[in-house]
UniProtKB/Swiss-Prot annotation:
UniProt membrane topology term: Multi-pass membrane protein
Protein family per UniProt: Belongs to the MAPEG family.
EC number in record: 2.5.1.18
Protein name: Probable microsomal glutathione S-transferase
């Protein structure tokens, strides 16, 4: 009998898990970049101030750290209550936006590009609030149907 992963791992688990895995991978790369920047700019832990380039990298790492605590559960809840494929699309949009922004911070390709910064801000916020709003709607609908409020 062939191994059927779809019956074991449904889409509402697999899709947000993929987003979470990639997001945590991005976060790990940023942590590595931050460690390298600490060595390069001679900023000893736990200090987070020093060279402006170091502060840029530390700032992006901090932004990602703060966002992961919200984006991962929102992606899972949206996938469960609304749509796994839409959670993949919205979570993927957030990830691509974050990767582009991270590249501009960490790789010095676009130091002060306001257009790229604005696109990142719009995409990341729209995708996050869509995930959060959809999750709240799904939970509300579930409660309404359960208790006929």
């Amino acid at each position: 009998m062939p191994f059927d992963t779809k019956s074991i791992f449904p889409d509402f688990i697999v899709f947000p898990s993929a987003i979470s895995t990639i997001a945590i991978g991005l976060w790990s790369v940023q942590a590595y970049k931050l460690g390298e920047a600490r060595k390069r700019y001679n900023v000893k832990a736990p200090h987070v101030q020093g060279d402006p380039e170091f502060e840029r990298i530390a700032h992006e790492y901090q932004n990602t750290s703060e966002a992961l605590g919200a984006i991962i559960p929102a992606t899972f809840m949206f996938s469960y209550y609304i749509s796994p494929k839409c959670s993949l699309l919205l979570g993927g949009t957030w990830l691509v936006s974050k990767m582009l922004n991270c590249c501009s911070y960490c790789c010095k390709k676009e130091k002060e590009n306001d257009c790229a910064k604005n696109v990142h801000t719009c995409l990341s916020h729209i995708s996050f609030f869509a995930l959060l709003g959809g999750s709240a709607f799904g939970i509300g609908s579930s409660l309404y149907n359960r208790y006929k409020l």
